[in-house]
């Protein structure tokens, strides 16, 4: 599944490794798609991708917002966190243990979301 996530991620962010800090895609009729590069360690990136909506207060709220680790050498990517209006979920606890059920669920969601982004015409370059 991690290789498929990587392939779909690169479809919507083909120049992922050359983007300095952030990027944004606008597709008519759909919410903007945002990218932030959080950390670089050689061939491994930690990124955040999100949609934002405008709250009645005027604040821009990310929903959803996911952090992902991307390994260029292995051509893999996996979900690390998920946040929306209802809460925050983390795959790995502070002691490094993995919630495998949550990991599977978030990776499935990420696959679907990346496919939807592509079908909506989103691309960050």
At which residue positions do the language-model features occur?
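N-terminal secretory-pathway/extracellular module detecting exported/lumenal segments
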Residues: 1-63, 72-125
């Amino acid at each position: 599944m991690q290789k498929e996530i990587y392939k779909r991620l690169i479809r919507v962010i083909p120049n992922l490794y050359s983007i300095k800090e952030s990027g944004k895609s606008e597709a008519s009729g759909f919410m903007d798609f945002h990218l932030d590069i959080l950390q670089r360690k050689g061939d491994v990136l930690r990124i955040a991708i999100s949609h934002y909506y405008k709250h009645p207060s005027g604040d821009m709220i990310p929903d959803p917002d996911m952090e992902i680790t991307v390994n260029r050498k292995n051509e893999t990517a996996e979900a690390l966190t998920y946040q929306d209006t209802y809460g925050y979920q983390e795959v790995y606890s502070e002691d490094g243990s993995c919630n495998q059920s949550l990991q599977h669920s978030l990776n499935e969601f990420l696959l679907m979301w990346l496919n939807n982004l592509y079908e909506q015409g989103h691309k960050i370059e």
